[in-house]
């Protein structure tokens, strides 16, 4: 028996009210939200998403601004390379697609910075096409409820096939099931504290039926701590540049982090990524 019907019924009464789930939300808004949600919690994304769409309501609006404006507006969302990719995608949409976000997966995949998950998510949630969409939350639900292990392990090619086997044939039902299973993994079947007492498919869950066995497979890679990392140093340098209307000198950048080797490595990485450019011996966001 598929878990989709029960999860979809639960979702109808328990899904969170999020901007990208509301009627009339644009395909561009969906694309922006997916970029932001890639590695940032929902609670931090919602206010920034609303700011972005008010400032840049269409791809053409963002394309007309500089990449530096996009990086500056990205601010504390983290992984600012996404801002450059989103700006590049906006330029491509404007130039290749007349300012309209494409709706088929191959065309979406051809845009800068868009991988398989984002392409499928936009095709499904913005345009209503039938595709399996697999993120970490969906992988966790399938691993536990259908396959039995307590964790999904590293991403694998079989993930899409596992989700495809669950999806209803009806296009509307499939779209709802994608969103519902994703939501279940986000708020109920969580990684550390699953709330099995309120789970709508607890009676169908293979992991629960087996007595919650410990996971013995290969685990997904765990992200290193942020404090003291190169990521933190990169963020501090970018924050310094965002706060300045003029290029920032190497001496000023030296004040943000005391360890010379790590600071220089972080700055070199930002330059290589195109997030920072050199200007007459100083540094600034890309123009």
Locate the predicted segments by residue.
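Generic start-of-chain signal for non-secretory N-termini
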Residues: 1-2
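Catalytic cores of DNA base-excision repair glycosylases
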Residues: 5-6, 10-232, 240-242, 247, ...
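Residues in the recognition helix of alpha-helical DNA-binding motifs
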Residues: 122, 266-269, 284-286
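Core RNA-modification/binding signature centered on pseudouridine synthases
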Residues: 242, 280, 285-287
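Short amphipathic alpha-helical interaction segments
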Residues: 257-272
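A short, conserved structural fragment
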Residues: 271-283
């Amino acid at each position: 028996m598929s878990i989709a019907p029960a999860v979809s019924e639960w979702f109808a009464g328990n899904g969170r009210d999020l901007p990208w789930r509301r009627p009339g939300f644009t395909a561009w808004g969906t694309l922006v939200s997916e970029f932001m949600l890639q590695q940032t919690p929902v609670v931090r994304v919602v206010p920034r998403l609303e700011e972005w769409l008010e400032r840049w309501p269409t791809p053409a609006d963002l394309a007309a601004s500089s990449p530096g404006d996009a990086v500056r507006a990205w601010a504390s969302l983290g992984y600012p390379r996404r801002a450059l990719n989103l700006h590049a995608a906006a330029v491509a949409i404007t130039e290749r697609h007349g300012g309209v976000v494409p709706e088929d997966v191959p065309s979406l995949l051809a845009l800068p910075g868009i991988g398989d998950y984002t392409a499928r998510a936009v095709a499904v949630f913005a345009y209503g096409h039938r595709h399996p969409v697999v993120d970490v939350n969906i992988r966790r639900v399938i691993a536990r409820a259908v396959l039995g292990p307590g964790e999904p392990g590293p991403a694998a090619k079989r993930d899409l096939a596992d989700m495809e086997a669950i999806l209803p044939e009806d296009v509307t039902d499939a779209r709802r099931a994608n969103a519902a299973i994703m939501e279940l993994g986000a708020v109920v079947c969580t990684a550390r504290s699953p709330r099995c007492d309120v789970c709508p498919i607890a009676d169908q869950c293979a992991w629960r039926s087996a007595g919650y066995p410990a996971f013995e497979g290969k685990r997904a890679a765990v992200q290193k701590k942020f404090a003291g990392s190169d990521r933190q140093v990169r963020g501090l340098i970018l924050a310094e540049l965002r706060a300045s209307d003029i290029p920032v000198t190497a001496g000023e950048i030296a004040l943000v982090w005391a360890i010379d080797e790590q600071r220089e490595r972080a700055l070199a990485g930002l330059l290589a990524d195109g997030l920072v450019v050199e200007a007459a011996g100083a540094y600034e966001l890309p123009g």
